[in-house]
Amino acid sequence: MNIHEYQGKAVLRSYGVSVPNGKVAFTVEEAVEAAKELGTDVCVEKAQIHAGGRGKAGGVKVAKNLDEVRTYAESILGTTLVTHQTGPEGKEVKRLLIEEGCDIKKEYYVGLVLDRATSQVVLMASEEGGTEIEEVAEKTPEKIFKEYIDPAVGLQGFQARRIAFNINIPKELVGQAVKFMMGLYRAFIEKDCSIAEINPLVTTGEGKVMALDAKLNFDSNALYRHKDILELRDLDEEDSKEIEASKYDLNYIPLDGNIGCMVNGAGLAMATMDIIKHYHGDPANFLDVGGGATAEKVTEAFKIILSDKNVKGIFVNIFGGIMKCDVIAEGVIEATKQVGLELPLVVRLEGTNVELGKKILNESGLNIVAAESMADGAQKIVSLVG
């Protein structure tokens, strides 16, 4: 689960991580009032959306007086920001972070992520802050320094100091930088984060080390023990179809194609998308109904797929292990009747009770195309969609 920058900074502040003073504003008047309360000569107005690249898209402005605060707030609030992370549809800006400006001397990058290869948290840092870390990793990987953290003992002071020296933090500020990284790590662990990214971390003319931006992503499976974090969820920033899918324990991710996919198991779902692409089709979604699908689940999955107006056909690809093929067949028939499906539907069943499942489909009287294999099903749906 993602949260907004201003929320992330509030979380970090509670762990002793230094961040600029700021206030969130939902209207132009609130933005002006927030700037007055901050009482600073220069303030920064930042669009609050769940996406990076806001500065390049015009979502970050520096205001030097209250008139500029008002002008920038009027120009940003209610507009749709399109960045490299939002997709072409962009995201509407419904809130601003009004933050005090600071005298930036140098920008750095600091982040914590899970490293699956070592099953450890890794602290990454670079003196190339303010730019996309992926870009730095691709062009100048030698500028990224890493410390792998033993989960039994946590981040050690010597590791944080080594990172600070490697990225050339001024020696008089190393102590502050170490405190910053230790606080960031505590927040990461105690709040069950999957990502904690500070880009940029800055040193200032006043001799401070602070986070000018904060991206925190939380493990959705751990939210049951973090009610305070769950309350920060902004449903307006999430895809409505993904929200609906989560209510039925369906894993749904929208894509840009026109062939809806309903599959059980993440691996089979990815293989299904691959084989559709292989036969020159374009999947419209990733949808994993899981191992315990019921007729109700299948019906809801159909409804979610069909809520995408780009979908021109559906491919159901089920391997019945825990799940029985006859249950899926009944669910497909029920869903087809309920939604009044008029689009081409190809169904491939394999596994437990497969013959019974096929019999149920064949005797349904509905226009359902049976497939003997995954490749056969992919070719048929691509052909039917045209």
Curated annotation (Swiss-Prot):
This entry's Enzyme Commission designation comes to 6.2.1.5
Q: Which domain of life is it from?
A: Bacteria
Q: Which residues bind substrate per the record?
A: N264, G321, I322, M323
Needed co-factor(s): Mg(2+)
Cofactor notes: Binds 1 Mg(2+) ion per subunit.
Q: Which reaction does it catalyse?
A: succinate + ATP + CoA = succinyl-CoA + ADP + phosphate; GTP + succinate + CoA = succinyl-CoA + GDP + phosphate
Q: Which residues form the ATP-grasp domain?
A: 9-244
Q: Where does Mg(2+) bind?
A: N199, D213
Q: Name one GO biological process term.
A: succinyl-CoA metabolic process
Q: What enzyme category does the UniProt record give?
A: ligase
The pathway that the record names for this protein is: Carbohydrate metabolism; tricarboxylic acid cycle; succinate from succinyl-CoA (ligase route): step 1/1
What's the family? Answer: Belongs to the succinate/malate CoA ligase beta subunit family.
Q: What is this protein called?
A: Succinate--CoA ligase [ADP-forming] subunit beta
State the species of origin: Bacillus cereus (strain ATCC 14579 / DSM 31 / CCUG 7414 / JCM 2152 / NBRC 15305 / NCIMB 9373 / NCTC 2599 / NRRL B-3711)
